[in-house]
């Protein structure tokens, strides 16, 4: 992967196809802008082999906020999605949905409530709560989790 591809893949496209296809479904159904809440949590403390941690430390919030600031669908991201095909060779994302991503998608439309960095956190208790448009929350979910999960693991 060259630098250009890495830059594209680490931006708003740091997600999976499921999140994008669900967002497109919400868009088609006309519910993409209803307010929704997403709770981010982890299920168990790290198991280091020789001992299992009794808690974790929240980390990665600054990185997550930086990532959110850069989460935009520009020309490169739209062209990448425009070239996505189904197994039958049909385009996966419609032009009107791609136009919405380019013109109207904004990670700034969400409210993020988070446990402060450095605080003790526990399994099954929300670390972040995202409130905002359903499709936006769906699209940014994987990127946010990928951004903070490793940092929490090593903190």
Predicted region positions:
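Ordered alpha/beta subdomains of enzyme catalytic regions
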Residues: 1-155
């Amino acid at each position: 992967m060259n630098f250009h591809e890495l830059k594209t893949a680490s931006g708003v496209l740091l997600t999976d196809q499921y999140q994008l296809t669900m967002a497109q479904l919400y868009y088609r159904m006309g519910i993409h802008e209803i307010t929704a809440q997403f709770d981010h949590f982890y299920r168990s403390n790290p198991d280091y082999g020789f001992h299992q941690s009794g808690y974790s430390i929240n980390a990665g919030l600054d990185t997550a906020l930086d990532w959110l600031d850069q989460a935009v669908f520009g020309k490169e991201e739209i062209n990448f999605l425009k070239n996505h095909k189904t197994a039958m060779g049909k385009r996966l994302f419609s032009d009107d949905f791609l136009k919405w991503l380019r013109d109207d998608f904004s990670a700034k439309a969400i409210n993020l409530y988070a446990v402060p960095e450095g605080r003790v956190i526990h399994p099954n208790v929300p670390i972040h709560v995202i409130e905002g448009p359903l499709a936006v929350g769906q699209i940014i979910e994987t990127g946010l989790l990928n951004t903070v999960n490793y940092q929490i693991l090593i903190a």
